[in-house]
Amino acid sequence: KEILYLFVFVFLIVPVMIESLFYDYALKILGNSLYAGVLMGLIMAVIFTFVVYLFCIKRYKLSWKDIGIRKLSWKDLLWTFVAVISLIVVSIGVLMIMEKLGISFENSKTETIQNDKSIYAFCIAVIGAAVISPIYEEILYRGVFYTFFRDRYGIWGGMLISSIIFTIVHIPTYNTLPVNFLSGVVFAWLYEKTNSILSAMIAHALFNFIAVLLTFMSN
């Protein structure tokens, strides 16, 4: 029942109430789509984290440790960096194949970043992509959704379903969906390997940081 509530928040309430209504208002005030997007990310982070706390932690008297926030060992950190490097290599391969097929990986997000290459804009983009998003997305998609589906359909079933959900929420940036799916699988695998979503958060943050950096460096 609680998972159903989360699905309603993720796929209905948040897209309609936050992204559709508040984004336009924020864009009008800030006058910059990058800043408005990061602000929306922060608002969604607070909402999603609160919903997870309300429906999962408080309701069942759990702790944040129960959804995967546990200390990492040096070995866990090593696995994290190996996973990030592997994900980057595979993602580059996927993007090269897409380019050969005539599918551009440029989208509204990359265009927004490339339109303003100031240090200030870079820092704002990094905060949104490499700080805010990894924290709340890993809590929700790996800490809650992956754990829920893993307990019912096994490790690979949990990875597949949670990664599909993670991919769907990145629509309408359709040309990056293959990479979104791959990253979802890798982050879920890391969580399973290290028994901590902190590893997934770090990997997610590093991957997004590199993506933002490369976007700023591109012509």
Which stretches of residues belong to each language-model region?
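Juxtamembrane helix-loop-helix connectors linking adjacent transmembrane helices
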Residues: 27-38, 62-133
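Hydrophobic alpha-helical transmembrane segments
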Residues: 5-7, 38-39, 77-82, 123-127, ...
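Structural signal for membrane-spanning alpha-helices in multi-pass inner-membrane proteins
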Residues: 52-57, 87, 91, 95, ...
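Hydrophobic core segments of transmembrane alpha-helices in multi-pass, intramembrane catalytic enzymes
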Residues: 44-48, 125-128, 179-187
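Membrane-helix interface segments
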Residues: 2, 33-34, 73-77, 118-122, ...
